[in-house]
């Protein structure tokens, strides 16, 4: 039976399901960034307020990386999961499809993203709630596994976010994440971000990009007292029908929209030309390129 989160935390009944191989502020999704060209400065925000557009832009990437991530985790069936920063439910859908969970609770600060998540088939099992990654509205030891999928760099205090993940899992429970390698310039949007920076413009980026480094993830997990900490790289590729398909899809990004909207039309045309040259098409006009994610897993000590 599913549970609604409560402000006053209560205990949760039910024996944890384990497997040795698997277990061996409220607006944190909005990043306030100052961008500027020359003497012109403007504050921009990353606002995740359109679940459908986000699905078109990031859905394929997220699913591709999430499939590999779950292959690596190899979780047993029937676990109680919490998906923190579930967004529009892309990874939650994978959990329901592949892991036959006993329960899934999705938490995200964006009601617009959650509205999209509730339209997915996964909503027949998963329950979605508005909430804060740094103050999860669940009792201690409520879940067998806690996951953040492509989220950690948006949490203002990553260590606090990880400590909350640890708190809500049972002793021996799994704490896992994967995050695009933004620090290393290997996120799906980096072909555009790199050219924006080359033009002398500071793009809108998440507040804690440093948390995407593999070393940072390992340090966060070890610092949280987790055991059996392991890491791995995940590399995925995506193909677009042509450059126009690539541009129309990626400009839906909540990180790119405010930056490009603040640019002069001539600068936008220059940016498009630079990105087009950076991503040569094949003989049929298709654009294919890759992105890299860093993943980490650990378990709460028994």
Go through each PLM region and give its residues.
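A short acidic, Gly/Pro-enriched loop at the edge of an enzyme's catalytic core
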Residues: 134-145
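Conserved alpha-helix/loop element of class I SAM-dependent methyltransferases that forms part
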Residues: 60-79, 94, 98
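N-terminal, positively charged/glycine-rich alpha-helical extensions of SAM-dependent methyltransferases
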Residues: 28-52
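Class I SAM-dependent methyltransferase SAM/SAH-binding core
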Residues: 80-136, 160
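Conserved catalytic/acceptor-binding region of the Class I
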Residues: 159-160, 166-241, 257-260
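A short SAM/SAH-binding and catalytic strip from SAM-dependent methyltransferases
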Residues: 144-158, 181
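Conserved Class I S-adenosyl-L-methionine
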Residues: 43-47, 88-90, 209-302
């Amino acid at each position: 039976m599913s549970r609604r989160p409560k402000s006053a935390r209560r205990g949760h009944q039910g024996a944890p399901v384990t497997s040795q191989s698997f277990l061996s502020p409220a607006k944190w999704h909005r990043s306030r960034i100052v961008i500027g060209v020359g003497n012109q400065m403007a504050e921009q925000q990353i606002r995740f307020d359109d679940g459908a557009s986000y699905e078109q832009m990031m859905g394929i990437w997220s699913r591709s990386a999430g499939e590999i991530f779950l292959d690596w985790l190899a979780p047993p069936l029937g676990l109680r999961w919490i998906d923190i920063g579930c967004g529009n439910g892309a990874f939650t859908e994978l959990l329901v499809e592949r892991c036959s969970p006993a329960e899934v609770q999705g938490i995200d600060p964006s009601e617009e993203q959650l509205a999209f998540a509730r339209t997915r088939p996964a909503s027949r099992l998963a329950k979605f709630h508005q909430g804060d990654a740094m103050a999860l509205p669940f009792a201690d030891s409520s879940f067998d596994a806690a996951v953040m999928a492509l989220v950690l760099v948006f949490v203002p205090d990553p260590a606090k976010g990880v400590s909350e993940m640890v708190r809500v899992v049972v002793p021996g429970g799994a704490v896992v994440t994967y995050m695009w390698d933004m620090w290393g310039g290997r996120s799906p949007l980096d072909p555009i971000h790199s050219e924006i920076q080359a033009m002398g413009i500071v793009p809108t980026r998440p507040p804690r990009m440093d948390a995407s480094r593999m070393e940072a993830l390992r340090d966060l997990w070890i610092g949280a007292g987790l055991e059996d900490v392991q890491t791995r790289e995940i590399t995925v590729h995506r193909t677009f029908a042509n450059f126009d398909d690539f541009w129309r899809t990626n400009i839906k990004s909540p990180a790119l929209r405010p930056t490009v909207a603040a640019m002069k039309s001539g600068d936008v045309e220059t940016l498009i030309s630079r990105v087009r040259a950076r991503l040569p098409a094949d003989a049929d006009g298709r654009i294919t390129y890759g992105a890299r994610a860093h993943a980490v897993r650990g378990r709460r000590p028994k």
